[in-house]
Regions:
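C-terminal scaffold of the Radical SAM
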Residues: 1-143
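Short, amphipathic alpha-helical interaction segments positioned at domain boundaries
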Residues: 173-188
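A short, conserved structural fragment
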Residues: 156-166
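Non-catalytic, well-ordered alpha-helical scaffold segments
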Residues: 118-125, 149, 175, 179
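Short amphipathic alpha-helical interaction segments
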Residues: 143-157
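Minor-groove-contacting beta-hairpin "wing" of winged helix-turn-helix DNA-binding domains
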Residues: 167-171
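An alpha-helix initiation/capping motif
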Residues: 35, 145-146, 172-175
Length: 188
């Protein structure tokens, strides 16, 4: 913390099959230890006046990653260059990773139109990564009344989500196991 940084991203290392680190027999750490490290990181960064603004991100006031917040707000973005991805006019695309194709003007590897259902799922899955959660007025403008979503009401009643005047967000005690909440919004 002697570096006086303005922004820190933290992630648990997950060892994936068929990677060099997996092949070298490195094992994932115990979940309890991972959780203890998560709590320690939160405590230390809070002490350093870094704001926990997204599941894996902390910053000093005014130094939040605008680039990443654009993703978490489910907004459009362009991707330029090999392997880049973008999201424009409800269409997701991925550029080719092949340099020869790219230099010959064949930029897009694949693209698909995002359905209304998937847009709504993404709004919850991405928006609830933010500690502030989903802005209810912004949601209303995009999709209509947020109060009509059954799974949302169920999660609020179970105290996994919290609703205030302006936002719906994950109860802080469930942030570490956030994925177990977010999965409820897929195919709901």
């Amino acid at each position: 913390m002697n570096l006086q940084v303005n922004h820190i991203s933290t992630y648990s290392l997950i060892i994936e099959p068929n990677t060099k680190i997996y092949i070298d027999k490195v094992k994932n750490i115990d979940e309890d230890l991972d959780y203890e490290m998560y709590k320690l990181i939160n405590k230390k960064l809070k002490k350093e006046k870094l704001i926990h603004y997204e599941l894996s991100n902390y910053s000093k006031k005014g130094y939040e990653s605008k680039h990443n917040l654009n993703y978490w707000n489910n907004n459009e973005y362009y991707g330029f260059g090999l392997g880049a991805s973008g999201f424009v006019d409800k269409e997701r695309y991925e550029n080719t990773r092949n340099l020869n194709k790219y230099t010959n003007g064949i930029y897009i590897k694949e693209k698909y139109l995002v359905s209304d259902k998937e847009m709504l799922e993404n709004e919850f899955i991405l928006g609830l990564r933010k500690i502030k959660g989903i802005n209810k007025k912004n949601f209303q403008k995009k999709y209509g009344d947020i109060n009509n979503i059954k799974i949302l009401k169920e999660l609020i009643n179970k105290k996994k989500l919290i609703e205030n005047k302006n936002y719906i967000y994950i109860n802080p005690k469930y942030l570490y196991i956030q994925n177990s909440i977010l999965i409820n919004f897929i195919d709901s």
